[in-house]
């Protein structure tokens, strides 16, 4: 779908993720000295010679070991190859040809897409040619010496990649997808939920905490709408995380919240809302993101007619700052209600981008003032709310012009927000209210006059 894909394949610790970052001009792929840091397949955008394409990084392939994750990593690499236009096997020039390299090369010969050999860690151009020559023995064509760290040789490698990509006409860009980030603590079922949504094993699933170490982007289309689903590393308290792959993965997860259009906050139905869930909810609200709360593992809960409403009431009491978010009880294991996620997420995004006319805003405010007047101080000073207007979207933000902001306490401010929600909707998105006093209004008018004078 959309741009062509280049799959990066190789054994552990040959520098695949470093090369991905070099080819894409970013630092999104997690790089660490220990082998096996990358487990799932992760996508990044790349651009070269007036061509846009995607690079998919895969976990290190090992064929003589069936221990935890390794069969799943091979399956992820196989899925990456099935959608790729070009396969790029990365080898270590300093180590030379290994048995594992030969096994991977033999495996790639059954791949339908063309294959290139990138001989990494060739920091010296002269020695690099000699190192690369040994890899002709893999039988995959000319080996290209590169240094992922320094960037040498990557231009020539990208030139060859571009030659093998399908023509522009056959890979036209589609509309920008809605970015949906799947956020939650470790082991709440985020990757299982992603796989259930996609109908394929898109992310490795295990009962071991921290299986997903990086953010994983998946593109799919539903009812003519393109979506980018971002599965993230489970986020624990920072003091519980040592410096390394998990630390970087958590940072990527927090950045995924920033770049998302809507967040799915996944809660474990068996655990309920924990302190860390509350922190994540607060981060989503702080970033001003649309949100849907997904209560996963609903199949494992013993229930009767009253279980769901009672549990929702309990969960909402602990997630009170997300009281505007819809809550959906699902089971990634059985698929129960999983497909409803798209409907509710679409509604949340629509409301997040929605704009309301000033006249409609003030109709709602006028009715709110009729039902409950602004507070009065002990000295007899009463707050006055003159008018309001929407100033931005994503999230919907309103400026409320008053005589003096400090006269309006938290209770009355919450009341006005509730009235705006009841009168205008805005399900699934936070609202931002800015209370502007007389001095602020005067300063804004002066600034507007100055701009008008400068334009004359």
Curated annotation (Swiss-Prot):
Keywords: GTP-binding, Nucleotide-binding, Repeat, Ribosome biogenesis. It comes from the Bacteria. The lineage of its organism: Bacteria, Bacillati, Cyanobacteriota, Cyanophyceae, Synechococcales. Belongs to the TRAFAC class TrmE-Era-EngA-EngB-Septin-like GTPase superfamily. EngA (Der) GTPase family. The keyword Nucleotide-binding applies. GTPase that plays an essential role in the late steps of ribosome biogenesis. Residues 354-439 form the KH-like domain. GTP 2 binds at residues 184-191, 231-235, 296-299. Residues 4-169, 178-353 form the EngA-type G domain. This is GTPase Der.
């Amino acid at each position: 779908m959309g741009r062509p894909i280049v799959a990066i394949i190789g054994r552990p610790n040959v520098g695949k993720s470093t090369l991905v970052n070099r080819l894409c001009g970013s630092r999104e792929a997690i790089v660490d000295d220990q082998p096996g840091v990358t487990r799932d397949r992760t996508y990044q955008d790349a651009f070269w010679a007036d061509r846009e394409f995607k690079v998919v990084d895969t976990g290190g392939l090992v064929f003589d070991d069936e221990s935890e994750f390794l069969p799943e990593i091979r399956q992820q690499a196989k899925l990456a190859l099935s959608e790729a236009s070009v396969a790029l096997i990365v080898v270590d020039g300093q180590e030379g040809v290994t048995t594992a390299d030969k096994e991977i090369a033999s495996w790639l010969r059954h791949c339908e897409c063309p294959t290139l050999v990138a001989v990494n860690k060739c920091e010296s151009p002269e020695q690099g040619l000699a190192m690369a020559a040994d890899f002709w023995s893999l039988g995959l064509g000319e080996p290209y010496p590169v240094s992922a760290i320094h960037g040498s040789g990557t231009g020539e490698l990208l030139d060859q990649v571009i030659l093998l990509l399908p023509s522009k006409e056959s890979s036209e860009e589609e509309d920008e997808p809605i970015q949906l980030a799947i956020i939650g603590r470790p082991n709440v079922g985020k990757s299982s939920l992603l796989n259930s949504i996609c109908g394929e094993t898109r992310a490795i699933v295990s009962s071991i905490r921290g299986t997903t170490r990086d953010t994983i982007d998946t593109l799919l289309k539903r009812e003519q709408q393109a979506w980018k689903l971002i599965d993230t590393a489970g986020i624990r308290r920072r003091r519980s995380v040592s410096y390394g792959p998990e630390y970087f993965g958590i940072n990527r997860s927090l950045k995924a919240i920033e770049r998302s259009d809507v967040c799915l906050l996944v809660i474990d139905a068996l655990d309920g809302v924990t302190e860390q869930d509350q922190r994540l909810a607060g981060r989503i609200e702080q970033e001003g993101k649309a949100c849907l709360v997904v209560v996963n593992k609903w199949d494992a809960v013993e229930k009767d007619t009253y279980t769901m409403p009672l549990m929702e009431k309990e969960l909402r009491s602990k997630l009170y700052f997300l009281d505007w978010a819809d809550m959906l009880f699902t089971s990634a294991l059985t698929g129960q209600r999983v497909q409803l996620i798209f409907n509710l997420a679409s509604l949340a995004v629509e409301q997040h981008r929605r704009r309301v006319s000033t006249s409609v805003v003030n109709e709602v405010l006028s009715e709110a003032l009729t039902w409950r007047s602004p507070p009065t101080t002990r000295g007899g000073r009463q707050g006055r709310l003159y008018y309001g207007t929407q100033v931005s979207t994503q999230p919907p933000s309103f400026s409320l012009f008053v005589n003096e902001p400090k006269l309006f306490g938290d209770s009355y401010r919450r009341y006005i927000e509730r009235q705006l929600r009841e009168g205008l909707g805005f399900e699934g998105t936070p609202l931002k209210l800015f209370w502007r006093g007389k001095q602020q209004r005067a300063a804004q008018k002066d600034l507007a006059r100055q701009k008008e004078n400068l334009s004359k």
